Structure formats: C-alpha cells, structure tokens
C-alpha cells in the first residue's frame, strides 16, 4: 500500500551524463516507464523523480579532457538523453533534479549527519562512519564486517578512518569544480546526491526506489545509510532493481564493440517503438539478451499488433451484428490473464503473451467471419486501453497512408509507420520504377530488405511490411 492512498512516489537513479546513454541504460528507463504506466493504469497518481548526475569523477574527467566547462560538457549528453527518452515514448518524470543545482540540500544533509556523529572530516573531505550504522548491508544481504571498498568508492582515493567508509563531501582539488559551502570547499560525493534530491522532492520516506541491479551495492546501501542515519526513518518502502542487458550472450562493453546507442540502431533503420517493445519484453529481474534476431522479432510483433488494430478500425462497419461469441470469449480470457500477470511483480513477458493470444484469436475470427461488430469494437477498445502501458500503437498523426505524385500519376504508399529515412528510400524506389530504372529500384529494395522492410508492389502503389529477419549480415 502506498503511504498516501492512490498516490505513489517513485525515485529512479538516473544517468550520469558523461557519455551518450546505451541500450542497457534504456532497458532500465523503459522498465521504469512501464511500471509508472501500470500504476497509472490501475488508478494511481504517480510522482516520478529521476536525478541527473552532472558532477562526479567521470563527468569531470571528460570535461577536463575536452577542455570544456563541466556545464557545457554535461549539457550535450543531458539533451541527448532527453531526446532518446522521447524517441522511445518514455513519459517524462515530474522532476529531473540535477546534482549541481542541489548543493545546498546536500550540505544540509551532511550537517545533520555530523550532528549525529555519523560523519567526520579528514584532509578537507567528509566521510560516513559505516561502523556506526548497524543496518549497513541489509538491502544487499552483505555482512559489513567483511566488506571491502570497491568500484566508484575505491576510485575516490581519499584518506579515511576505515576502508568501508565512503565520501559524503570531497575536498577541493586543483582543476576540479568545487563549491564554497558551510562544510568546506569541495564537491558532493555520488551517493550523497541521490539522498538529498530524493528527500527534497518525495519526503524523508517515500514509496518506491528503483535502480539497476549493479546499484544495490554500494550505491543504494550508502543512500540508506545517509538518509536513515540523518532522519531515523526508512528511506523507501520498496526497493526494485532491474537486471542487466547483455548482447549476444556477452556483457556489453565498448572494448567489445557491442555497446549500442539508440542513435546507432535508429541510423540502421530500426523502429524505436520496436526497440521499446524488445526492452520491455523480458521480466525486469531477468537478464535481457539483445540480438538483432530478437530485434527483428520485436519489429514483427509490433507490426502484427498495429496491422490488426488497423484491420479492426477499417472492418467494423462491415461485420455482422451477432456472431458465435468467439471474440467475446477470447477477450475475456486475455483481459483476465493480462491483469493477473501484470499485477504479479510486473510480469511484462506474461502480459504480452496474453495480449498476443488475443491478436491471434482475433485475426482467426476475422478470417473465418466469426467476429461480430460489437466484439470487434470491444477488442479494439481493449488494445487501445492496454496500450496506455505499452505505447506501441501509432499515434494519430503517425498513421502512414500517403499519396505521392510521380510523373503525373497519384500513387499510394501505405504501411506500418517507419522512420523518415526509410520512407525516403520507399519513395525513391517508387520514382525509380516510374522511370523504368529497374536496376536502381532493385538496389533500393535490397537496402530496405537489409533494414528489415519488405515491399509489395500493387496497381495503386506500394505497401511495406516489417520482416522478422531484422538486420541481415
């Protein structure tokens, strides 16, 4: 139960804007978006806060390397992140607090910790005393007596009383940005940022805290220690962690050349909505194995759904008023199964399975003439209703049924929405065929096939379809 009836406060650990986000990052963002949409679909009002880490070791190193100000350096990647969220149809959070804009809140939190003797100063930096917080390690089920400094903590390389202690405030260093505050000249530690900003926008205790599974330790343990240490109250009622995305069964990394950005995939001609579908199709607590074959299958799945919705929209008036009831029964089964599975720890894969069972049953009923007009209307309304969660269906302005004039003839180009550059290839091929330049037309067709788009020439023009094969080669 939420702390306040029908209202849910959610804090999500957002990007560190030192580089362009990759599809592993967006697996998390799509999951958060689906979770938020499910909560809203079930009648809750959601307040989502996602931080932007725009000051840390990586952002400082990047800005220094390019001889840019920290603000200029991080602004480029922050803007790109928001652009990618839009392309993936991710609804915006209510707040995107930037770390550099909340220094005062962080200073106040450190002062509260010092007042409780949970923080100490050493050589200009301020650290949290882990040994004075007995619940440290409970979230990740680790014994604090056996913990070692790892990852981003070890990289801080600052002096401290105990190897397990972590930096709250880092003393100023030459060439690094710093703030002159009541607790000294320096900059915030990574963990401090999230504690201060989550409590500012959601209160000392809120409903749900989410992040990647790699953040459970040490980041979320440190957040809990700071926040609970300062307030004496739980930070969040529930902690949810999204598992990793891997590529072709292998960990994603720049060194292996398999760390894909959204822009890379879009430049290859892939539909961002199909990418969204793929990222949402596996339960969040399981690894998602990204492959181009899987992306092709996601393209095909989205196409099947969109084509059925378009079919239902066009055929409703021509259907019989009554039928054998196949459509009604299929809808009831799908709706019940969908609701049960999506409510079971956000089981997206199971819920999608129920949705596509209805796609299959509806197409079969239409093919046999066994779907009544009332059933078709109800099924169409159901698909639009659950799409409040998935955001897969074409928006009103994105329905692609265009007429093109070539050599004085008006031709039609009709199909599932595709990217503008792919549509330009479709148009160029239509022009080549009209000019009887069949060699050029065949080459353009081959380019589209490699992008997972097949063409069907008709007397009126051309139709396109998304293939299961996705990317070839």
Which functions belong to the PLM regions below?
Residues 1-18, 29-34, 83, 104-314:
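Alpha-helical recognition segments enriched in aromatics with Gly/Pro capping
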Residues 45-47, 117-123, 454-456:
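Short, well-structured beta-strand/strand-turn elements
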Residues 52-57, 78-81, 91-106, 124-133:
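Short, glycine/charge-rich beta-strand/loop segments that flank catalytic centers
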Residues 61-65, 136-137, 223-224, 471:
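Short low-complexity, flexible loop/linker segments enriched in glycine and/or proline
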Residues 63-70, 94-100, 212-213:
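The substrate-binding groove and active-site-proximal loops of carbohydrate-active enzymes
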Residues 258-473:
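Structural preference for alpha-helix termini/caps and helix-kink/transition segments
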């Amino acid at each position: 139960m939420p702390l306040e009836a029908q209202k849910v406060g959610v804090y999500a650990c957002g990007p560190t804007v030192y580089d362009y986000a990759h599809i592993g990052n967006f697996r998390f963002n799509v999951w958060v978006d689906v979770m938020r949409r499910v909560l809203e679909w079930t009648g809750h009002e959601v307040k989502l806060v996602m931080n932007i880490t725009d000051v840390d070791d990586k952002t400082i190193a990047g800005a220094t390397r390019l001889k840019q100000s920290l603000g200029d350096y991080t602004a480029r990647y922050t803007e790109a992140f928001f652009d990618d969220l839009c392309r993936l149809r991710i609804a915006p959070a209510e707040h995107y607090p930037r770390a550099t804009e909340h220094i005062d809140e962080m200073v106040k939190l450190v002062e509260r910790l010092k007042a409780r003797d949970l923080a100490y100063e050493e050589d200009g930096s301020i650290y949290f005393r882990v040994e004075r917080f007995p619940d440290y390690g409970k979230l990740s089920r680790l014994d604090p007596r056996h913990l070692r400094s790892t990852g981003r903590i070890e990289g801080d390389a600052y002096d401290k009383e105990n190897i397990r202690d972590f930096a709250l405030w880092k003393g100023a260093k030459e060439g690094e940005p710093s703030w002159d505050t009541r607790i000294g000249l320096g900059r915030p530690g990574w963990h401090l940022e999230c504690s201060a900003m989550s409590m500012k926008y959601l209160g000392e205790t809120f409903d749900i805290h989410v992040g990647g599974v790699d953040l459970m330790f040490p980041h979320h343990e440190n957040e809990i220690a700071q926040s609970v240490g300062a307030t004496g109250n739980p930070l969040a009622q529930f902690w949810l962690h999204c598992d990793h995305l891997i590529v072709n069964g292998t960990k994603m990394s720049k060194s292996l050349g398999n760390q894909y950005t959204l822009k890379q995939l879009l430049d290859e001609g892939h539909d961002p909505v199909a990418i969204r579908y793929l990222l949402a199709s596996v339960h969040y607590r399981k690894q998602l194995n990204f492959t181009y074959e899987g992306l092709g299958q996601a393209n095909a799945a989205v196409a099947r759904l969109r084509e059925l919705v378009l079919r239902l929209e066009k055929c409703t008036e021509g259907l019989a008023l009554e039928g054998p009831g196949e459509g009604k029964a299929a809808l009831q089964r799908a709706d019940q199964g969908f609701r049960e599975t999506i409510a079971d720890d956000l089981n997206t894969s199971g819920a999608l399975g129920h949705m596509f069972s209805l796609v299959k049953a509806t197409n079969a009923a239409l093919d046999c003439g066994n779907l009544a007009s009332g059933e078709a209307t109800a099924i169409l309304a159901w698909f639009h209703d659950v799409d409040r969660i998935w955001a897969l269906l074409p928006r009103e302005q994105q329905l692609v049924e265009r007429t093109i004039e070539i050599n004085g003839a008006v031709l039609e180009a009709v199909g599932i929405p595709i990217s503008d550059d792919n549509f330009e290839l479709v148009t160029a091929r239509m022009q080549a065929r009209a000019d009887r330049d069949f060699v050029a037309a065949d080459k353009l067709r081959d380019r589209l096939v490699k992008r997972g788009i097949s063409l069907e020439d008709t007397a009126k023009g051309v139709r396109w379809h998304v293939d299961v094969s996705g990317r070839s080669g």
